[in-house]
Amino acid sequence: MSASSPSSAAPDDVEEGLVLRPKFDANGLITCVTTDATSGDVLMVAFMNAEALQKTIDSGDAWYFSRSRAKLWRKGESSGLVQKVLEMRLDCDQDAVWIKVEQGGGAACHTGRRSCFYRRIDRDDTGAPLLTPVDAERLFDPAKVYR
């Protein structure tokens, strides 16, 4: 990536400048929030390393870095449910990415749901936290897709 190092840039250059200076964490990752470009709904939160960010910029497809598998992956490479990036943004200090996508097949979550955020935190009768399914319909069977 041809971006300048964030540590060498003045805060004003990072916050107001026009040069891409992503600020990766100690593990070389940056948080990426992915939303549906039409509805604005949050589909998922994932991580990108420098290579994933560059591949996303270059290809127009969403690429991420899997922390659990320690590898780069293109969204949809297993399921076929590719995310086409319509817009990318960085936050004010360039340590988080927001991408607006067209979600192929309608489902972004590996559980088969449209969004990874399919449980709302409520409280039970005693006041203890309770997860309540919302928008939890499965659009595909993960056991059949991820063999």
Swiss-Prot record:
One of its GO terms (molecular function) is magnesium ion binding. Binds 1 Mg(2+) ion per subunit. GO terms for biological process: L-histidine biosynthetic process. One of its GO terms (cellular component) is cytoplasm. Zn(2+) binds at residues 92, 109, 116. Pathway: Amino-acid biosynthesis; L-histidine biosynthesis; L-histidine from 5-phospho-alpha-D-ribose 1-diphosphate: step 3/9. Belongs to the PRA-CH family. This is Phosphoribosyl-AMP cyclohydrolase. The gene is hisI.
